[in-house]
Design a protein with these regions (language model features):
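Surface-exposed, beta-sheet-biased, low-hydrophobicity segments with strongly acidic/polar composition
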Residues: 1-198
């Protein structure tokens, strides 16, 4: 005789955030941020294109840097796209990234089937087969924007209110002066060497 134990598994309710009401701003000429925004990417038939500098959703032919559709992300750079963007994944905390690396940025590409993809974003989340929820991994993406500037961002959440998937919350910093500096310069700790300088 076999004994079967049936347990109750409850699905956790992830935090949910409503899409940020975005008002365009002037393009920063220096380091701007960190700024936290939630983008509505629930539609599976169109991309939500985000302009990091202007902190707004790009319409029509307006320039954009990052596009999201459900859990898919791409940058505005690569064959068939109008920008020079690329992205690099770093397995380090957002606050620790103070300068963008000089190279290694992966562009997006259009597949033979017409989909736009960027392999650098593959695996940005963990998927639970028990709860069927996506949880962002603790990684930072460094972005070369559509016009060659630099930014960094980390994905914080993927859910809208009511556990509805597709509201991508991210924190980002944008550098408007053309340099690769993405955070405050960290000062060196004071020396404990008591010898006079030679």
């Amino acid at each position: 005789m076999a004994l079967v134990v049936v347990g109750s598994v409850t699905r956790p309710t992830p935090p949910g955030f409503a899409a940020t009401v975005l008002t365009p701003r002037a393009r920063p000429e220096s380091l701007a941020g960190p700024d936290t925004v939630t983008l509505d990417a629930r539609a599976d038939d169109r991309w939500t294109r985000f302009d990091l500098a202007r902190r707004t959703i790009a319409a029509g032919g307006e320039p954009w840097d990052l596009a999201v559709k459900r859990h898919h992300l791409v940058v505005n750079g690569g064959t068939g796209l109008g920008g020079v963007g690329g992205v690099l994944r770093l397995d380090r905390p957002f606050a620790d990234i103070v300068e963008a690396p000089p190279d290694g940025y992966g562009p997006s590409r259009v597949t033979p089937g017409g989909d736009t993809v960027n392999a650098t974003f593959d695996g940005w989340y963990r998927y639970s087969y028990l709860s069927h929820l996506l949880t962002p991994r603790p990684v930072t993406f460094v972005l070369r924007t559509h016009d060659g500037r630099f930014a960094k961002f980390a994905i914080l959440n993927y859910y809208c209110p009511g556990a509805d998937p597709g509201c991508l919350t991210l924190v980002y910093t944008y550098q408007g002066d053309g340099t690769r500096r993405l955070g405050p310069t960290r000062s060196k700790p004071p020396s404990t060497d008591s010898r006079p300088d030679r």
